[in-house]
Amino acid sequence: MLEIPDDRCGRAKLFKAIDDAFKAGYFEALGKALGGSARWFDEKMPFELGLGHPLEYAIYWSPAAFITTLLDAGSNPNYEDHAGFPSIIAALSTERPDRLEIVRTLIEHSADPNMRGVNDWTPLHYAVAQRDAEAIRLLLASGADPSLRTRIDDCETALEGADQAGFEAGASLLREALSRRG
């Protein structure tokens, strides 16, 4: 069980040890810093330190190989994220040059390409908002459903969002995918 220090300096040192282990991709050191639980790689991290799920933190801060290590150890790529950034959407939201490779890795480890996140968007909705045709192509090839609508606000599909935004490259990919579905 991880003991959270009461004093700010102690919490800062603990956070730094955790953050450094994530950024370096040190699996054993990270497990120890997080208290040594047998399944630390799939348990929410301490709220007091402003941390969420280990896989989400790794998506933002760790080497891609470490993300694979966490997934291979059993970290759930479909973790719940009440802030709206489940794994695929978290990966798409980064400015990492390898973000599409991370999305591919997540999907290869059974991440749901139709997961819901911020604004009830699917990863396709998020890729449209980012104007990322390559992400749309990857998601469609991985089984993402282009007919899904958000269940709030305008209840729109990713295609409707692309049309509204004037994102023709994305709209074209989505139209083509919808026409293949029949």
Segments (PLM) and residue ranges:
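Extended repeat-based scaffolds of very large eukaryotic assembly and lipid-transport proteins
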Residues: M1-L14, D19-S37, G52
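Ankyrin-repeat-protein effector appendages
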Residues: L2-I18, S142, E156, E160-G182
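Ankyrin-repeat boundary/"N-cap" motif
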Residues: G10-I18, E43-Y57, E80-S93, R116-T122, ...
